[in-house]
Amino acid sequence: MKHVDIFTDGACSGNPGPGGWGAVLRYGETEKELSGGEADTTNNRMELLAAISALNALKSPCEVDLYTDSAYVKDGITKWIFGWKKKGWKTADNKPVKNVELWQALEAAQERHKVTLHWVKGHAGHPENERADELARKGMEPFKRR
């Protein structure tokens, strides 16, 4: 099984507002960069889309170390999702889970891979995370109102 490192980030101008996501995928010496955005979104949606898009870009099952500066993404997929599913995608206080379609897409995207999630402090000089942030801002650009 190939080993791939993935670094993701999301950005939003206003929250909600125009947003973007970025991802850097590294397999050995090979790197691939992905980015995209939406006109009206939130930072959490962009963080989720970065991870989903990166995992879906992998052509075969891989062992993945996924680095995110989003505690929301890390805690959601490693802790909260199990309870949400048990309760029919409801939170502890019985409210519908926000961004449920993205959580379901992230769960599906990681199913064929062996994913280990890592939280990194954002904007702390981590080169690949800084690059993912640049890509997220680039992905947001076309949607910003001038």
Curated annotation (Swiss-Prot):
<comment type="similarity">
    <text>Belongs to the RNase H family.</text>
</comment>
<feature type="binding site">
    <location>
        <position position="133"/>
    </location>
    <ligand>
        <name>Mg(2+) 2</name>
    </ligand>
</feature>
<feature type="binding site">
    <location>
        <position position="9"/>
    </location>
    <ligand>
        <name>Mg(2+) 2</name>
    </ligand>
</feature>
<feature type="binding site">
    <location>
        <position position="69"/>
    </location>
    <ligand>
        <name>Mg(2+) 1</name>
    </ligand>
</feature>
<comment type="subunit">
    <text>Monomer.</text>
</comment>
<dbReference type="InterPro" id="IPR050092">
    <property type="entry name" value="RNase_H"/>
</dbReference>
<keyword id="KW-0479">Metal-binding</keyword>
<feature type="region of interest" description="Disordered">
    <location>
        <begin position="123"/>
        <end position="146"/>
    </location>
</feature>
<dbReference type="GO" id="GO:0003676">
    <property type="term" value="F:nucleic acid binding"/>
</dbReference>
<keyword id="KW-0540">Nuclease</keyword>
<dbReference type="GO" id="GO:0000287">
    <property type="term" value="F:magnesium ion binding"/>
</dbReference>
<dbReference type="GO" id="GO:0004523">
    <property type="term" value="F:RNA-DNA hybrid ribonuclease activity"/>
</dbReference>
<dbReference type="GO" id="GO:0043137">
    <property type="term" value="P:DNA replication, removal of RNA primer"/>
</dbReference>
<feature type="domain" description="RNase H type-1">
    <location>
        <begin position="1"/>
        <end position="141"/>
    </location>
</feature>
<feature type="compositionally biased region" description="Basic and acidic residues">
    <location>
        <begin position="125"/>
        <end position="146"/>
    </location>
</feature>
<keyword id="KW-0378">Hydrolase</keyword>
<comment type="function">
    <text>Endonuclease that specifically degrades the RNA of RNA-DNA hybrids.</text>
</comment>
<dbReference type="GO" id="GO:0005737">
    <property type="term" value="C:cytoplasm"/>
</dbReference>
<feature type="binding site">
    <location>
        <position position="9"/>
    </location>
    <ligand>
        <name>Mg(2+) 1</name>
    </ligand>
</feature>
<dbReference type="InterPro" id="IPR036397">
    <property type="entry name" value="RNaseH_sf"/>
</dbReference>
<keyword id="KW-0460">Magnesium</keyword>
<keyword id="KW-0255">Endonuclease</keyword>
<feature type="binding site">
    <location>
        <position position="47"/>
    </location>
    <ligand>
        <name>Mg(2+) 1</name>
    </ligand>
</feature>
<dbReference type="InterPro" id="IPR002156">
    <property type="entry name" value="RNaseH_domain"/>
</dbReference>
<dbReference type="InterPro" id="IPR012337">
    <property type="entry name" value="RNaseH-like_sf"/>
</dbReference>
<dbReference type="Pfam" id="PF00075">
    <property type="entry name" value="RNase_H"/>
</dbReference>
<protein>
    <recommendedName>
        <fullName>Ribonuclease H</fullName>
        <ecNumber>3.1.26.4</ecNumber>
    </recommendedName>
</protein>
<keyword id="KW-0963">Cytoplasm</keyword>
<dbReference type="InterPro" id="IPR022892">
    <property type="entry name" value="RNaseHI"/>
</dbReference>
